[in-house]
């Protein structure tokens, strides 16, 4: 039996279940079990910390949390997100056909390719330009994080880095990461897909955040 539900379309919904075919799920202080269909809570292109937050927001909605409570938690999450280092705001991808596109570009100059491939090749190029012999080269099949960049002398719009790279080089950390663009991809789009149909004032969580940042005199620059 379900206690409450969020129904977006016929094949996209979530229910808070307290009786799962005779097994009680609302015991030991737990609210029940969330059954979700088609909501992309665990998409591989979503960072784990965002997956966890989406699940948290969904549970609040299913537990009949008020709009203000949910918007406050989103505002707080935005603040935490902004304080993260730029490279932690990227999107996970799997690098495919890197070798193929690198060879293609060597033959014919600039070639069209998927964004995550371009970002991976940009990492390899910057690694060479910085005479970095220690960081891993991105090759086919590697898991990478793709980060968006602000305007820069190289004209790059994004750069990837290997998930397994334990010591990110300083030349990489110093790149001009575009936190606002990544916030839109990671937070705005994902929340819009999940709770957009509820017509909550998600825009207000941005305005509140900007206001708080402007008047947070105790914070560091």
Predicted regions and their residues:
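DNA-dependent DNA polymerase catalytic subunits
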Residues: 1-221
């Amino acid at each position: 039996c379900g206690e409450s539900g969020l129904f977006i379309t016929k094949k996209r919904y979530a229910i808070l279940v307290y009786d799962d075919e005779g097994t009680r799920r609302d015991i030991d202080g737990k609210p029940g079990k969330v059954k979700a269909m088609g909501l992309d809570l665990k998409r591989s292109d979503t960072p784990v910390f965002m997956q966890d937050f989406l699940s948290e927001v969904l549970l609040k909605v299913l537990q009949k949390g008020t709009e203000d409570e949910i918007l406050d938690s989103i505002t707080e999450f935005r603040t935490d997100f902004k304080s993260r280092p730029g490279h932690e705001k990227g999107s996970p991808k799997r690098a495919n056909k890197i070798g193929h596109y690198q060879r293609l570009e060597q033959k014919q100059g600039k070639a069209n390719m998927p964004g995550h491939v371009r970002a991976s090749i940009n990492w390899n190029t910057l690694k060479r330009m910085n005479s970095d012999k220690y960081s891993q080269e991105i090759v086919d099949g590697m898991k990478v994080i793709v980060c968006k960049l602000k305007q820069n002398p190289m004209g790059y719009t994004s750069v990837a880095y290997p998930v397994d790279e334990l010591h990110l080089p300083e030349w990489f950390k110093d790149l001009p990461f575009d936190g606002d663009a990544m916030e839109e991809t990671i937070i705005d789009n994902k929340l819009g897909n999940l709770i957009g149909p509820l017509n909550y004032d998600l825009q207000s969580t941005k305005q509140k955040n900007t206001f708080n940042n402007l008047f947070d005199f105790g914070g560091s620059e």
